[in-house]
Amino acid sequence: MKSCGVSLATAAAAAAAAAFGDEEKKMAAGKASGESEEASPSLTAEEREALGGLDSRLFGFVRFHEDGARMKALLGKAVRCYESLILKAEGKVESDFFCQLGHFNLLLEDYPKALSAYQRYYSLQSDYWKNAAFLYGLGLVYFHYNAFQWAIKAFQEVLYVDPSFCRAKEIHLRLGLMFKVNTDYESSLKHFQLALVDCNPCTLSNAEIQFHIAHLYETQRKYHSAKEAYEQLLQTENLSAQVKATILQQLGWMHHTVDLLGDKATKESYAIQYLQKSLEADPNSGQSWYFLGRCYSSIGKVQDAFISYRQSIDKSEASADTWCSIGVLYQQQNQPMDALQAYICAVQLDHGHAAAWMDLGTLYESCNQPQDAIKCYLNATRSKNCSNTSGLAARIKYLQAQLCNLPQGSLQNKTKLLPSIEEAWSLPIPAELTSRQGAMNTAQQNTSDNWSGGNAPPPVEQQTHSWCLTPQKLQHLEQLRANRNNLNPAQKLMLEQLESQFVLMQQHQMRQTGVAQVRPTGILNGPTVDSSLPTNSVSGQQPQLPLTRMPSVSQPGVHTACPRQTLANGPFSAGHVPCSTSRTLGSTDTVLIGNNHVTGSGSNGNVPYLQRNAPTLPHNRTNLTSSTEEPWKNQLSNSTQGLHKGPSSHLAGPNGERPLSSTGPSQHLQAAGSGIQNQNGHPTLPSNSVTQGAALNHLSSHTATSGGQQGITLTKESKPSGNTLTVPETSRQTGETPNSTASVEGLPNHVHQVMADAVCSPSHGDSKSPGLLSSDNPQLSALLMGKANNNVGPGTCDKVNNIHPTVHTKTDNSVASSPSSAISTATPSPKSTEQTTTNSVTSLNSPHSGLHTINGEGMEESQSPIKTDLLLVSHRPSPQIIPSMSVSIYPSSAEVLKACRNLGKNGLSNSSILLDKCPPPRPPSSPYPPLPKDKLNPPTPSIYLENKRDAFFPPLHQFCTNPNNPVTVIRGLAGALKLDLGLFSTKTLVEANNEHMVEVRTQLLQPADENWDPTGTKKIWHCESNRSHTTIAKYAQYQASSFQESLREENEKRSHHKDHSDSESTSSDNSGKRRKGPFKTIKFGTNIDLSDDKKWKLQLHELTKLPAFVRVVSAGNLLSHVGHTILGMNTVQLYMKVPGSRTPGHQENNNFCSVNINIGPGDCEWFVVPEGYWGVLNDFCEKNNLNFLMGSWWPNLEDLYEANVPVYRFIQRPGDLVWINAGTVHWVQAIGWCNNIAWNVGPLTACQYKLAVERYEWNKLQNVKSIVPMVHLSWNMARNIKVSDPKLFEMIKYCLLRTLKQCQTLREALIAAGKEIIWHGRTKEEPAHYCSICEVEVFDLLFVTNESNSRKTYIVHCQDCARKTSGNLENFVVLEQYKMEDLMQVYDQFTLAPPLPSASS
């Protein structure tokens, strides 16, 4: 297949050939000297050529079962050959070896080996980020393991370094799925839409992507939009049967569960019709049968419901929901014994099924067995998905009180209608289910997971584990338990054995029956099933319905995880979606990561990566063992059990072939409960369990336990001993010593350190399961992970990055290949395992910063790799003829264009306005050293003005713009300048423009320093803020009535002589206690546009009295040079507030400064965090599944205190002006009734420009539109402003150089391709242009669709999006807005101005 993306470098291939020849000579010399060596595998020239084009971009497109056996064999041979040579070279080979090894293992779906090889490549290659194929492969591996946080980062970086990457559609698809699981629905929709417009091949069809969009609407409870999207999709031609069945199933269940879709009778009628049609398309869907049963049950058709449930059990026995619903029907039919057995089957399959436990408790209570009822209710409350914990707690308390009042012994003497809960497990149906489940699980372990193409697995002889108890043994166990006090020693021994076997059996079932939480949807995701069961009573005249035994499911063709069907287009197939909300299984700790269940026994050892606060990609705590030991055993004993394929995992390849890795012991990553079956290595995709409030917080705490430790702790057994070095986490220093608790926090960059993952957890201290490499060769495993070396010395790694250039201070006990610096702004240069990085990072703005080397150039390698590129297969980026860095910023434009013709693409095709050589931007690390706790509540810089002269005093401007002052409060400004604030009062606004539009945010009234969930049970970061619209007149009415209501409440309090309690709008002293919910709802009027100088002439004129540096328009304001209106930035916006109105946490657009004046009459409370800590807040947002840039969040002050983040906190009174400096993070709450006005300002400083450009690049990485068009602004600045600051001048000149080069290069490419460029000059005040698809700024050359050009609507695309929608640009015209001569003139005339004379004081 045609390769794409990063081209193969001829020069690299030639060098590799020479290296290969040298290596052969060395081996020959070794043999001649008498060394005995085994014959190593070798590749022919033809094989090397065939392997040349294979890399991660073919993942999902190579089918080994379709004439692919030779390819698979070749890849296997290549892997063996590489491993052999690496072993002989003792790991000292070219870094590209490991990258290729990662690609080959990825294509073979050997994920542990692929990850290890990619990690090794990362550790050796300082500019790894230039290799898009590497980043893509790494992202696929993370995606496979549902490590979504890291997969998202890797995929975003691919698109950043290579926007035209040929697998961009695959990336957008996966990003859409991951953001959906993370409940970031806006981002999810954006990426699904980006995938749809891309015409490149993809493993999913467009119809399947459209299904995801429809399901996204359903997840958001936008049911009418979802219904419309589903119905529209049904009209698609050539729709596959599987997709059609899934859509109909969704529509059927939506009509059953959503009240908005009509009255009950109509809804149920439609629901049944849709489900019946779905079953016509896919008769084997157990889930559709289950839904149909629920519909029949709700309308009283009991017989039909039983038939449907029976069909569901036949198709997929392991469904706790189905068994629970059967129990409800039996209970309604007054058949308690049958109901009991059905409920027991449900909780057997899913120990955390709250609904089944509650129904079982109700059953026992109705049979007057309160002790058993209490046990069931307690189990229900322990479930994470219990929605009525308080009600159950009250019921338990009531029943316990009743028991206390009963005469002693009365319960023992009473005949029981039902067996006790302990005895119920050995009843015939549950016991048979237990036995079958154990047998099936055993069978699964011995069966290839061959589900591609809908093939069923071959019959496998049932084997029952020694611990799989038969019904007879279960009965014997209960008898022994009942007579525990009277047993002889032999019987006690037997009891102990049976109990231990019973525990093992339960744990195994819990691991294997994640399917209890799933239902097949045919595609990826489905609706969340309402776990509350039908409450309608069924007439008692219904005939008794015997509970017959269900057929065995061990027959061929039936799989525990329900049958799956392959989708038409490749690796994603029909999968399963959780019924009801995500559940945990009993005492076995389970975390839904994405939708895969990672089960463990109280240990974190079975998750690939763990972290607490890490914002970037993995980084292990590393223990380097002595090279004399067997490092592969010590290092990998425990850390990565979750990476292994285990029985019943859905990690098999397209034909069910398992990767070459060994199978771990009992713990494995299980992909049950997923929305898409894993074919071609893609992990199962997310389901919708969010609609019931159980959003899959997939890696928010990054622990494998539901209640276990929050990180990995070095136990006594796992503590490094002897010749070891423990590597401290470097990106998030909290002051602990290097050997302190090794919680994996900082996970910067892309990869875990491969040198060791030897952090044992208490439960698995002695485990010897294979780790990352799963290699049969321990020496090779050790080499691939990085050999242990004792010559690690201190060193520095000082680098420049395009975001926050930083310097690392020299520290001991550090390891070079740690990617920690990447999380900050520096680029790591991990050339070898002997090099060192650092423990701390300081911002360029700090007094300790310095710029030592650029991108690692000048770094010495302590390990010289032997040139042994055995395959002549190089996946390096194309050779860099002339680095952009070598082009001076001072030559003329003619020299620049001449140089640009030689530059080529420089290996990249990105449009970063920074240097080519800079890696993708990263959030900054928390400043180091951390502030002491007594410095975390600093005083707010405040200036009191007494008269007009004070306001215009030059040092005021300097004080506000000083980067060391994140915020300044200018008190008494309105009085000093005699501003008429009454012009902005509600009364005046109503009189001026009462029908003017107001955006309204509906919020919850809470204390300013707290943010609780709607129930008031826990503090959260998500801030409820739902958008709607109204008019100034209507909001004014609400504002006034709110004030009147408050007065009335205050008077009532006084009249009742109640003690005055703290107002809800002020801070509370009881911050740690539970708040009573629900909270009162309030409305906040925001973003009221005052840009129209005709409507708001008086108001805008009044603001011209302000000092020049805070005015809306001034020569020294960068935003005044944009040349067009940016609403709310270079125009005024008004805010109308009632107490409790919140402006959630944010930084200003593109990190510009902002001005805010309180009109009054009430106060506002402000919370401010310095710019250098935004990376920490970004981490918290990621941890809480919130989008830092676009989400609504309110920081938890306790979290910030623990993370050593300083918070400025102050009150803004009427007439006070708050200056928010560049990049400052802030959030605001109104204390009283007030109005505010605000706008942005861009001081003409290097700091402001630098931060604006950094955010421009970060926005590009995050697929967020930059409101300020920085390229357009930079050219306007060059035209309009004389710059005397050398730093600011150089940054602007760099931007001009970059864009001049890009315009020229693109121009020449279009002319060479025969594409006509049409002149379309800019008009006055014409806004800057953005791509209508990806929203990046488009400068000079606009790609406009033919249709929009003829209609003069001009729908603009960037070059990359244009090529994705039309490969040869035949559907586009190219419009040119600037003549190259004009740009050259601006560039040449922009020179450094002489410094201004210093102002006299």
Curated annotation (Swiss-Prot):
A biological process from GO: circulatory system development
TPR repeat ranges per the UniProt record: 95-128, 132-165, 169-203, 207-240, 245-285, 286-319, 321-353, 355-387
Tissue expression profile of the protein: Expressed in brain, heart and spleen.
Biased composition (Polar residues): 439-453, 596-606, 619-642, 660-743, 834-848
GO molecular function: chromatin DNA binding; histone H3K27me2/H3K27me3 demethylase activity; identical protein binding; metal ion binding; RNA polymerase II cis-regulatory region sequence-specific DNA binding
Residues with the Phosphoserine modification: 769, 829
Region (Disordered): 439-463, 596-745, 795-863, 914-941, 1043-1080
Residues the entry annotates as binding Fe cation: 1146, 1148, 1226
Zinc in keyword set: yes
Reactions it catalyzes: N(6),N(6),N(6)-trimethyl-L-lysyl(27)-[histone H3] + 2 2-oxoglutarate + 2 O2 = N(6)-methyl-L-lysyl(27)-[histone H3] + 2 formaldehyde + 2 succinate + 2 CO2
Low complexity bias: start-end ranges: 814-833
Cofactor(s) essential for the protein: L-ascorbate; Fe(2+)
Positions with biased composition (Basic and acidic residues): 1046-1063
Interaction with SUPT6H as annotated region, ranges: 1-1095
Signal sequence range: none
Composition-biased stretches (Pro residues): 918-931
InterPro entries: Corepressor-Demethylase, JmjC_dom, KDM6_GATAL_sf, KDM6A_B-like_C-hel, KDM6A_B-like_GATAL, TPR-like_helical_dom_sf, TPR_rpt
Top EC class for this record: oxidoreductase
Entry's EC annotation: 1.14.11.68
Residue sites binding Zn(2+) per the record: 1331, 1334, 1358, 1361
Functional note: Histone demethylase that specifically demethylates 'Lys-27' of histone H3, thereby playing a central role in histone code. Demethylates trimethylated and dimethylated but not monomethylated H3 'Lys-27'. Plays a central role in regulation of posterior development, by regulating HOX gene expression. Demethylation of 'Lys-27' of histone H3 is concomitant with methylation of 'Lys-4' of histone H3, and regulates the recruitment of the PRC1 complex and monoubiquitination of histone H2A.
Assembly description: Component of the MLL2/3 complex (also named ASCOM complex), at least composed of KMT2D/MLL2 or KMT2C/MLL3, ASH2L, RBBP5, WDR5, NCOA6, DPY30, KDM6A (or KDM6B), PAXIP1/PTIP, PAGR1 and alpha- and beta-tubulin. Interacts with TLE1. Interacts with SUPT6H. Interacts with SMARCA4. Interacts with PROSER1.
PANTHER family: LYSINE-SPECIFIC DEMETHYLASE (PTHR14017), LYSINE-SPECIFIC DEMETHYLASE 6A (PTHR14017:SF9)
Other remarks in the entry: Escapes X chromosome inactivation.
Family: Belongs to the UTX family.
Name this polypeptide is given: Lysine-specific demethylase 6A
Species annotation: Mus musculus (Mouse)
